Amino acid sequence: MMEKTVRRGTRTGFTTGACSAAAARAAVLGLVEGAVPEAVDCLLPNGDVVRFAVNDGACEAGQAAHAMVIKDAGDDPDCTDKAHLTADVRVLPGRAGEVVLCGGFGVGTVTMAGLGLEVGGPAINPVPRRNIEENVRAVGGPLLANAGIEVTISVPQGVEMARKTLNARLGILGGISILGTTGIVKPYSTSAYRASVVQGVQVAATLGHGVVVLTTGGRTEQFAMKERPELPAACFVQMGDFLRYALDEAVAQGLREVVIGGMVGKLTKIAQGETITHANRAEVDTQLLAELAARVGAPPDVCAEIAAAETARFGAERMQALGLGEPFHHALAQAVVQTLTAPDRYGDRFHLTVLVCDFDGSKITEAASGPAATA
């Protein structure tokens, strides 16, 4: 097994990129030494050297070799845990010093611009790409003096695993991405999802519509798609809790329109100034909801109930029962617009529309800012 911290609940793991680099290094050692080792010491992008167990080692007359490393994600609930990161390497006669990296079965193919990867090429991100080559060169020197080495990374379970990722939305088809900026997976880290949100905004920016639609989840995305049917699916990004990263990237990409689709809970947090809306970051400001309720005509006793409640949903349902659901949610949407377009936030860098739906995904209301400033 791979070496890592063993304290329950905090056991780190290794990225698909690190496992691919280890498999490639082991396979190249097979070319050089005539036998694939049962374990290999691999240099990670963060500078650590980690020993990985190697499986299915095989060599073919010094011209080709095969090795596989089983990904251990540690205590992180990663959909690529136990993936078989497989490297097939072969000698390229007459191409001294070249290392050619290819994607095999189960590694996605990039079909859209905006990801920093070649369209038509394998979804192997820049850091793992460099790390794989670095490990290949570290042990392949004797071969590379006179020939090149081709490395093909494949993942037998990659097509199925990719269905649990956002790859298809990002235009990465046919498998998973080979990822990892450090080589290490931290338990319950949000870095991978956060990166996918940023990538989603980047892809949306390449489509020429000048707009990205940010939603908090699947239900709000389906709702938003009904509201903006003229837009392709790649303009919609499930940002989860990561509004700040999505909006910062929208500004960086020069997008002139941003649409946010959400329900009362997340929208309340945004209205109160939170741009990372995870439940652990801040409590819902029910006093704010009570003030909005009062503004649209709720009686004082109801406002007091809303202020004392534990959830935003209580306030929404209480106002709906009074027949004040639409004006209440409209006031909330306006509060979101005012918060995000304040001069010390995003100002007029983009036109903002906030779409509000109920818990069944049906539209309640919307609010919008003034026109965006001319670029």
From Swiss-Prot:
Sorted keywords for this record are: Cobalamin biosynthesis, Methyltransferase, S-adenosyl-L-methionine, Transferase
Q: In which pathway does it act?
A: Cofactor biosynthesis; adenosylcobalamin biosynthesis; cob(II)yrinate a,c-diamide from sirohydrochlorin (anaerobic route): step 6/10
Q: Pfam families this protein is in?
A: CbiD (PF01888)
Protein's GO biological process = anaerobic cobalamin biosynthetic process; methylation
**Transmembrane stretches, start-end:** none
Q: Which domain of life is it from?
A: Bacteria
For the keyword Cell wall biogenesis/degradation, the answer is: no
Among InterPro entries, the record links this protein to: CbiD, CbiD_sf
Q: What EC number(s) does this enzyme carry? A: 2.1.1.195
Q: Known catalysed reaction(s)?
A: Co-precorrin-5B + S-adenosyl-L-methionine = Co-precorrin-6A + S-adenosyl-L-homocysteine
Query: Is the Methyltransferase keyword given for this protein?
Result: yes
SUPFAM superfamilies, alphabetized: CbiD-like
Q: Which GO terms describe its molecular function?
A: cobalt-precorrin-5B C1-methyltransferase activity
State the family named in the UniProt similarity comment for this chain. Belongs to the CbiD family.
Its recorded name reads Cobalt-precorrin-5B C(1)-methyltransferase
Q: Which organism is it from?
A: Paracidovorax citrulli (strain AAC00-1) (Acidovorax citrulli)
Name of the gene? cbiD
